[in-house]
Amino acid sequence: MNYRLKKISGDASFREFYRLKKNNKTSIIVSAKKEKYKNLIVYSVVNKILNSNKITAPKLISNHYKNNMMEISDLGEHSFLNLIIIKKNKANDYKSLIKIIFKLQQIKLKKNYKMGKFKIKFPKYTLENLHKESDLFFDWYLKYFLK
């Protein structure tokens, strides 16, 4: 078998992402520092919630939480930002995005989620959380994508 691993850009977290190419198929390896491995479990639960609500998110292929990593499906190399930069007619893309935001708002979270032996409980989303995440947009996303 022919394997190739290439680091790819990540998100505003401490996770690292790598594209794994096995023959002609790709997947994503996500790793975290040892003390942050539980974040991988939360990441998996969030993706599972999104998928169960018909919102496209990576699917868990295999977990190696004890080794601070997991393998997820590869959704491709294009971000929403990349797509709207190259398109002339962006209206349909923005309409799709608004539909996704509406779907996100309709999700009713359970009190607890289970992933293997782990129980995950999401804290209540507060105005303070909103401000922190809004700051991420300016501090991380804009700096990263508008270089």
Enumerate the predicted regions with their spans.
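Short Pro/Gly-enriched beta-strand edge/turn motifs at strand-loop
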Residues: M1-R4, V42
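Short, surface-exposed acidic
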Residues: Y3, L146-K147
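ATP-binding glycine-rich phosphate-binding loop
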Residues: Y3-K21
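Hydrophobic residues at beta-strand termini and immediately following loops
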Residues: I8, I72, F137
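ATP-binding pocket architecture of kinase catalytic cores
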Residues: Y18-K132
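Active-site activation/catalytic loop segments of kinase-like enzymes and analogous catalytic loops
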Residues: K132-L146
